Amino acid sequence: MRLKNHSSVSEFLLLGFPIRPEQGGIFFSLFLAMYLITVLGNLLIILLIRLDSHLHTPMYFFLSHLAFTDISFSSVTVPKMLTKVQNQPIPITYEECVSQTYFFIFFADLDSFLITSMAYDRYMAICHPLHYITIMSQSRCAMLVAVSWVIASACALLHSLLLDQLSFCADHTVPHFFCDLGALLKLSCSDTSLNQLVIFTAGLAAIMLPFLCILISYGRIGFTILQVPTTKGICKALSTCGSHLSVVALYYGSIIGLYFLPPSNSKINNNIVASVMYTVVTPMLNPFIYSLRNKDMKGALKKLLSKKTEFSK
């Protein structure tokens, strides 16, 4: 059913990437490979966590949800982009654009909340090990994930409803490869001050506040380690937190650089590069980060492969 907006615009044109037509095949192959790696890698993480009882812990519970979110996050933008990357611009209907905006914001915020929950889990494991099992109970972990879903859904719904109230000018070309909310607001003929206020407020609540909580958590972890600076303790902390810190740096580095730092002269191209980093590259790298630097994940993978070999015999 057609959304009730104040605009006669029936579709938008996504300009996609600033590339030459002959480069379309290369970009199609590249992004298709990255998307397949994202889906298969994160599905493997979910499978390993489900099958290996040693991974039925709070940290891996959050990781399985993060893997699902990463698959969904990339799936919001990449498949649509792949269908027309060799024949830009990319047409997208008004309804599809609003829906894409909703799910993009939803999974982006959910990613942020889940990464924060994982930092809280690491903080409790290192700073309060005696109370860890009691505090990080199965019900507590499920509650953290459920609250993350509810808040992310509410934020995305608010942005989408406000977007649907806007009128759009004759120019309906979006200088991006997906329906980016900021780019859409620039095309509007309506007053977008309320939208901008909500973006700023929600950005603080969904991105900057979780990032601050992560920094505080790791600050407390570092302080705890330095109180008893043994080589074994430092190595254990790095093993426990190293993978998560890498994900934090990739995800928040891209988003903060895109939305919270002063714009540069080549703002459009920089926006596209930063968006590719946190919508395509980061979800693709997460399985490698968590598997290559994690003994438990590597052990679970070896057991799965050994079982497969025995079954084939």
From Swiss-Prot:
It comes from the Eukaryota. It is a multi-pass membrane protein. GO terms for biological process: G protein-coupled receptor signaling pathway; sensory perception of smell. Residues 47-57, 119-142, 218-240, 293-313 are cytoplasmic. Disulfide bonds join C97-C189. Keywords: Cell membrane, Disulfide bond, G-protein coupled receptor, Glycoprotein, Membrane, Olfaction, Receptor, Sensory transduction, Transducer, Transmembrane, Transmembrane helix. It holds the Pfam family 7tm_4. PANTHER family: OLFACTORY RECEPTOR. Belongs to the G-protein coupled receptor 1 family. Odorant receptor. This is Olfactory receptor 1J1. It comes from Mus musculus (Mouse). The lineage of its organism: Eukaryota, Metazoa, Chordata, Craniata, Vertebrata.
